[in-house]
């Protein structure tokens, strides 16, 4: 993961296509992609392969996912729904959820998350 501040100088432009790809949530999810952390926000370009995704988990901080390609099937707050291309998913803090790429194809999305917990040394993803 890249950092927004490098040797005291801010980096202003990030090229996701040339950044290192890695597993983004460890064993909690099949998500892979590139990410960086700014002073207060985590951002990533994430891909979930067709029919794969996350186990039930939550983040102590607020999260937004904007779907660029494909669709995500989400279970959250006792509801199941699909988030299609061009739509934004809001995940409130501490909300248990799963997100899986639909069987129709891979899903690619941008994720933004507050990093208050990370700065406090707390886990940023908690599997349930």
Question: Model regions: which residues?
Answer:
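Conserved short histidine dyad/triad with adjacent acidic residue
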Residues: 27-30, 44-58, 93
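Short acidic-glycine-tyrosine-enriched beta hairpin
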Residues: 78-93
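Structural motif
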Residues: 71-73, 80, 96, 106
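A short, N-terminal "cap"/entry segment at the start of jelly-roll beta-barrel domains
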Residues: 1-40, 45, 124-128
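Ligand-binding loop in jelly-roll beta-barrel domains
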Residues: 93-119
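Short, conserved beta-strand element in jelly-roll/cupin
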Residues: 47-49, 58-74
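Short histidine-centered beta-strand/loop micro-motifs
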Residues: 33-35, 53-59, 100-102
């Amino acid at each position: 993961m890249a950092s927004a501040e490098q040797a005291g100088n801010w980096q202003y432009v990030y090229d996701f296509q040339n950044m290192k790809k890695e597993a983004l949530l460890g064993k909690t999810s099949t998500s892979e992609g590139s990410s960086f952390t700014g002073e207060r926000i985590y951002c990533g370009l994430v891909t979930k392969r067709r029919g794969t995704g996350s186990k039930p988990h939550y983040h102590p901080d607020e999260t937004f996912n904007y779907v660029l390609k494909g669709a995500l099937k989400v279970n959250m707050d006792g509801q199941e729904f699909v988030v299609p291309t061009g739509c934004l998913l809001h995940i409130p803090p501490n909300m248990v959820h799963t997100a899986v790429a639909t069987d129709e194809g891979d899903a690619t999305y941008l994720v933004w998350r507050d990093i208050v917990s990370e700065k406090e040394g707390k886990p940023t993803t908690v599997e349930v």
